[in-house]
Swiss-Prot record:
Gene Ontology MF terms: DNA binding; DNA-binding transcription factor activity
Top-level taxon of origin: Eukaryota
Family: Belongs to the ARR family. Type-B subfamily.
Protein name in the entry: Two-component response regulator ORR24
InterPro entries the UniProt entry points to: ARR-like, CheY-like_superfamily, Homeodomain-like_sf, Myb_dom, Myb_dom_plants, Response_reg_B-typ_pln, SANT/Myb, Sig_transdc_resp-reg_receiver
GO CC annotation: nucleus
Source taxonomy: Eukaryota, Viridiplantae, Streptophyta, Embryophyta, Tracheophyta
Record field: compositional bias (Gly residues): 9-22
Stored PANTHER family: TWO-COMPONENT RESPONSE REGULATOR, TWO-COMPONENT RESPONSE REGULATOR ARR10
Compositionally biased residues, Basic and acidic residues: 151-162
Domain Response regulatory, residue spans: 30-145
Segments of skewed composition (Acidic residues): 191-202
DNA-binding region: 210-269
């Protein structure tokens, strides 16, 4: 059906038919369909007819616009394609929305979000995708009802708004006229001017009332006047009106003063809160002046004693493997270690060592300045069972020789058994050539002023001073995994054993990781306990089991009289490992580089005053006993 036929139908019975079918809405709803594709237009027409709509079709947007302008009231809905050759569908949408205010549904095969959004923002009430379905077309009548309801509501609102505006204008005119009359009369009575001048003044007053009031800037001088007025009246009795009178400043209203007074009161309240908080803090810390609260906490700081320089600070990094072996906190945690007495002759010394820190041991100075508690436990007069007297040992590759019988106390070299994996690894390792020489350099780390006595080619002996039970002399011994020596299971670092320090451990030992833990036994009733150390290695199958006897002398075979301990410290003629008496339970903590010790020991040493009154000199690198 052509456009002309459609126009005749609309102008003829189509209108009457539409008018007759208005009672059965949406049956007979008038729809204008616009599409440049004849096939799509034909399908759309058939679907609309199946919905019992009156349909008018056209293939050009310009023709549809002309038809709408000529018959504005003859259509209820417009369905238009987006892409048309003569005119874009969005342009047609804008024109229909501006001129006819009809609901327009956009139809397109492009379902992109941007295209749909563009159609909705231009005023389309719906956006349908081709091919159109019958179910979608059966519900398009909702847009017609929605548009009519919105139009009716807008018309009603416009009418109401117009009536209200008209009434307000009338009232405003009457009020304005009355006000102008009163002002004109007052001005004539006061000034005696003409009516024209009064009218001009009234107009000026009306203009000034509509102007925005200038903002008040509180300068320093203005604030000083405000504060002076508040202080004169009192903060409790200060009100904006009285403050304004006392200030006597122009261009300031009571509202400005009231706002500033409120801010000023909040400021004073905040100051009082801060002051009370500082006072409470000062009272809590015992200070008198709140300004010195932070310094008050140091009032009794001198009770801890004065600082002193630890003389061995420079030796603790490389040479001092054990620096605090005589401190209670350098040993086992309280209550976690064994506390029963130790019997002599049934335990072995388990040493498993790693070589991370052995690179810093120069010429056997492994325990320089370190005091070690190598203490024995047992009844007085006990001897070492299972050890016979005979000749001293020679090398690590030889078998166990008889121990020689004499009153001398010697400490020969600590030898590893041939089956020991540590000996095998050290002897065969190409990276540590000096570690394999077990027959050369196992010496005692003693001060330089002590004479080195060689019972064999490279042996050192030291005089041992102690107060305690006498112990049978032992000449020399060798190490194996099962030799029962002392009645305490010593687990310690290589440096913790008296006179068991390798001199040639100055090679590069960075591949190893040195970690140690130290523990000890309780000391009861003037009995002495061995200091036990355990040195673990990060290398697999790397262990060293060396029983050791930390009791030696440097006398040439003369035992003499055992001298007592002197004030718990090392003398010039004393070996680094003296017997020390402690009656505290031991605790272990970690020091730097995996050593044993505690922070409390360091703090006690730092705050302990120097004891130089007794005149006893220290060996270089020695720490005080706690």
């Amino acid at each position: 059906m052509t456009v002309e036929e459609r126009q005749g139908r609309v102008g003829g019975h189509g209108v009457s038919g539409g008018g007759g079918g208005r009672d059965q809405f949406p049956v007979g709803m008038r729809v204008l369909a616009v599409d440049d594709d004849p096939t799509c237009l034909k399908i759309l027409e058939n679907l609309l007819l199946r919905c019992q709509y009156h349909v008018t079709t056209t293939g050009q947007a310009a023709t549809a616009l002309k038809l709408l302008r000529e018959n504005k009231d003859q259509f209820d809905l417009v369905i238009s394609d987006v892409h048309m050759p003569d005119m874009d569908g969005f342009k047609l949408l804008e024109l229909v929305g501006l001129e006819m205010d009809l609901p327009v549904i956009m139809l397109s095969a492009n379902g992109e979000t941007q295209t749909v959004m563009k159609g909705i923002t231009h005023g389309a009430c719906d956006y349908l995708l081709k091919p159109v379905r019958l179910e979608q077309l059966r519900t398009i009548w909702q847009h017609v009802i929605r548009r009519k309801n919105c139009d009716a509501k807008n018309r009603g609102n416009d009418d109401d708004a117009g009536q209200k505006a008209q009434g307000m204008n009338n009232e405003g005119e009457s009020i304005g006229a009355n006000r102008n009359k009163r002002q004109s009369r007052k001005s004539r009575d006061e000034n005696g001017d003409d009516g024209d001048d009064s009218d001009e003044n009234s107009n000026e007053n009306g203009d000034s009332s509509t102007q925005k009031k200038p903002r008040v800037v509180w300068s320093v001088e203005l604030h000083r006047k405000f504060v002076a007025a508040v202080n004169q009246l009192g903060i409790e009795k200060a009100v904006p009106k009285k403050i304004l009178d006392l200030m006597n400043v122009e261009n300031i209203t009571r509202e400005n003063v009231a706002s500033h007074l409120q801010k000023y009161r909040l400021y004073l309240k905040r100051l009082s809160t801060d002051a009370s908080r500082q006072a409470n803090l000062a009272a809590a810390f015992g200070g008198r002046n709140p300004a010195y609260i932070n310094m008050n906490s140091f009032g009794n700081y001198n009770a801890y004693g004065r600082y002193r320089t630890v003389p061995t600070a420079g030796h603790t990094q490389a040479n001092n493997i054990l620096t605090r072996m005589n401190s209670p906190s350098a040993f086992g945690v309280h209550g976690l270690l064994h506390s029963q007495p130790i019997q002599l002759g049934h335990a072995q010394n388990n040493l498993s060592t790693s070589l991370n820190d052995l690179g810093g041991l120069n010429n056997g100075n492994m325990i320089r300045g370190a005091q070690m508690s190598t203490i024995l436990t047992g009844p007085s007069g006990n001897s070492f069972p299972n050890i016979s007297n005979g000749a001293p040992l020679a090398t690590a590759n030889r078998s166990l020789q008889p121990l020689e019988s004499s009153s001398q106390q010697h400490l020969s070299r600590v030898h590893s058994s041939s089956a020991d994996p540590f000996s095998t690894l050290v002897g065969e390792s190409p990276q540590f050539p000096d570690l394999g020489r077990t027959t050369n350099t196992w010496q005692t780390a003693v001060p330089s002023n002590i004479q080195d006595r060689g019972h064999n080619d490279n042996m050192s002996q030291a005089t041992l001073h102690m107060n305690g039970p006498k112990i049978e002399p032992v000449s020399s011994f060798t190490s194996s995994n099962q030799i029962p020596l002392l009645g305490n299971e010593m687990q310690g670092q290589v440096a913790s054993l008296a006179s068991n320090v390798p001199i040639a451990f100055n090679q590069d030992t960075s591949p190893f990781n040195y970690g140690s833990s130290t523990n000890s036994r309780d000391m009861l009733n003037n009995s002495h306990v061995f200091s036990n150390s355990s040195i673990n290695t990060s290398l697999p199958n790397l262990s060293l089991d060396n029983p050791a006897v930390p009791k030696q002398t440097l006398d040439r075979g003369n035992t003499g009289i055992v001298s007592p301990m002197q004030d718990g410290r090392i003398h010039h003629q004393a070996v680094s490992n003296q017997l020390n008496y402690n009656d505290d339970l031991m605790r272990t903590t970690g020091l730097q580089r995996g050593l044993s010790g505690g922070l409390d020991d360091i703090v006690v040493d730092m705050f302990r005053p120097d004891r130089e009154d007794d005149g006893v000199p220290y060996i270089d690198g020695d720490w005080e006993l706690v």
